[in-house]
């Protein structure tokens, strides 16, 4: 059973999972109604690593039963008490950081250096952040006249559904769970079937800190478990992170029940480098080269991946000579080794999708500057899902510039001036992220305001602090993740309009 001690950690090379995971419902481990399980594999080697509950509508109903049974008491729990529980969750995660980071690496294939330095610290910080935000949240009082006052209260929605992706399994769960739980809601969460195990390690670790029914985790496939959750008339909100096509379906399901949605969907983010970045060979230029190479972070499996690079034509040759060298210096290898920079794609299906786009790019006439094929790392890793970091040169009308690949692939083109850079940057269906690099603050400001995207990194990229709003324009989504505004997204506002006058209005 979970306890307040550090859980045994046997090293990053030791499998961190149980042989089989049931669903976590009402504070207990509950076998799937059908009795069926599916096989989970690790992207590192392609080997089978355990069995996961294959849930259906009946399991979702059990989780909703538990959530509804808990919602009144949890919603009435004081903000101070809820915040203290959030802090305890963060503390226990921090004490078991190596265990959780290892579980993420085995489950997703990303390097242990990233899960240790980014995924888990960020996840922990989100619980602490929303504990603080909750304690600081205030209602309001409006004086209408001498005898009439309007009170405004923040109240939880009740029971909410959340569906998380496979690229940052635990971090994306914490992005959604922290504000929802802080706001006083009970949650039914469905992980991605590609990465179902790491979140269960986490649930086993912290599950006893929350009252039964506040957190419920049901594994399974999209149509079998995700659809029944998203279309249920027993949830007051659905939050989803994933592909835009699936997001449209989620929105359709929600519309049938007239419930709010938060959708964090696809992207094709431009990363724009102006000529002055190469004016000097200094720390800033080195930082810009790292910014270019950020397309390979997390194996390119990031919704904001800077997968389109725009370089001012006057510095193209100089910049790209150094950029290609930087990419070729990336160490690809066993994700469990601390010096590995890029690991495995999350699934064999994703690997095949990326390979198909490498073929598309070549057929479109794009020039391969480096990479362009699968990586065979030999030994036990030969069964894993590895792709070489790839740079294409082409133009923005190509499919590799317009369609989300979700892999370590970047497509590079040039621009003459700010106007052309802005035109190319905005020539996309998406609007999730963007990067602007320049030594000129005016250039950065004008470009940042002109780009139609929800997050514009300026002289940086892939930073995800809790106190910065994250979300998309256009077909990249609806609503925001992170930032204190997320607390409002999981609450509803009650207005009490109170008259203290003994006098009638006089209409009747």
Swiss-Prot record:
The keyword NAD applies. Its EC number is 1.2.1.3. GO terms for molecular function: acetaldehyde dehydrogenase (NAD+) activity. The keyword Oxidoreductase applies. Keywords: NAD, Oxidoreductase. Induction: Induced by growth on hypotaurine. The active site is at 264, 303. InterPro entries: Ald_DH/histidinol_DH, Ald_DH_C, Ald_DH_CS_CYS, Ald_DH_CS_GLU, Ald_DH_N, Aldehyde_DH_dom. Pathway: Organosulfur degradation. It catalyses: acetaldehyde + NAD(+) + H2O = acetate + NADH + 2 H(+). Catalyzes the NAD(+)-dependent oxidation of acetaldehyde to acetate. Belongs to the aldehyde dehydrogenase family. This is Aldehyde dehydrogenase. It comes from Paracoccus denitrificans (strain Pd 1222). The gene is adh.
């Amino acid at each position: 059973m979970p306890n307040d001690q550090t859980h045994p950690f046997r090293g990053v090379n030791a499998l961190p999972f149980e042989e089989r995971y049931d669903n976590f419902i009402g504070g207990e481990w509950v076998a799937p109604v059908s009795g069926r399980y599916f096989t989970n594999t690790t992207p590192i080697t392609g080997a089978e690593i355990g069995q996961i509950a294959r849930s259906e509508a009946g399991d979702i109903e059990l989780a909703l039963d538990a959530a509804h049974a808990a919602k009144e008491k949890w919603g009435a729990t004081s903000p101070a008490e809820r915040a203290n529980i959030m802090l305890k969750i963060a503390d226990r995660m921090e004490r078991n950081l190596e265990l959780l980071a290892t579980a993420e690496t085995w489950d997703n294939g990303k390097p242990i250096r990233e899960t240790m330095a980014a995924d888990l610290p960020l996840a922990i910080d989100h619980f602490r952040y929303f504990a603080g935000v909750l304690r600081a949240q205030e209602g309001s009082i409006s004086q209408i006249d001498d005898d009439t006052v309007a009170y405004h209260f923040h109240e939880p929605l009740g029971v909410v559904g959340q569906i998380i992706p496979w690229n940052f399994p635990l971090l994306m769960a914490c992005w959604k769970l922290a504000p929802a739980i802080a706001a006083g809601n009970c949650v039914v969460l469905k992980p991605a079937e590609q990465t179902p195990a790491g979140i269960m390690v986490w649930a086993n670790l912290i599950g006893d800190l929350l009252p039964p029914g506040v957190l419920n985790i049901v594994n399974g496939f999209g149509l079998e478990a995700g659809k029944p959750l998203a279309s249920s008339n027993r949830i007051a909100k659905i939050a989803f992170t994933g592909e835009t096509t699936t997001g449209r379906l989620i929105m359709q399901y929600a519309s049938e029940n007239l419930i709010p949605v938060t959708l964090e969907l696809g992207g094709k983010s431009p990363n724009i480098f102006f000529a002055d970045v190469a004016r000097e060979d200094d720390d800033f230029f080195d930082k810009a080269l790292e910014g270019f190479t950020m397309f390979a972070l997390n194996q390119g499996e990031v919704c904001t991946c800077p997968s389109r690079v725009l370089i001012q034509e006057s510095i193209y040759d100089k910049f790209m000579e150094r950029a290609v060298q930087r990419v070729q210096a990336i160490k690809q290898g066993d994700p469990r080794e601390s010096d590995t920079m890029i690991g495995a794609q999350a699934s064999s299906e994703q690997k095949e999708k990326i390979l198909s786009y490498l073929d598309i790019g070549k057929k479109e006439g794009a020039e391969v500057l480096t990479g362009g094929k699968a990586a065979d790392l030999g030994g036990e890793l030969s069964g894993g899902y590895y792709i070489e970091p790839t740079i294409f040169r082409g133009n923005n009308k190509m499919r590799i510039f317009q369609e989300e690949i979700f892999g370590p692939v970047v497509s590079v083109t040039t621009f003459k001036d700010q106007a052309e850079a802005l035109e190319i940057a905005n020539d996309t269906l998406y609007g999730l992220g963007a990067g602007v690099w320049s030594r000129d603050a005016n250039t950065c400001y004008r470009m940042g305001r002109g780009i139609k995207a929800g997050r514009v990194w300026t002289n940086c990229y892939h930073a995800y602090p809790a106190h910065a709003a994250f979300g998309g324009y256009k077909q990249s989504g609806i609503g925001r993740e992170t930032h204190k505004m997320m607390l409002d997204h999981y609450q509803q506002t009650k207005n009490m309009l109170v008259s203290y006058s003994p006098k009638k209005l006089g209409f009747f």
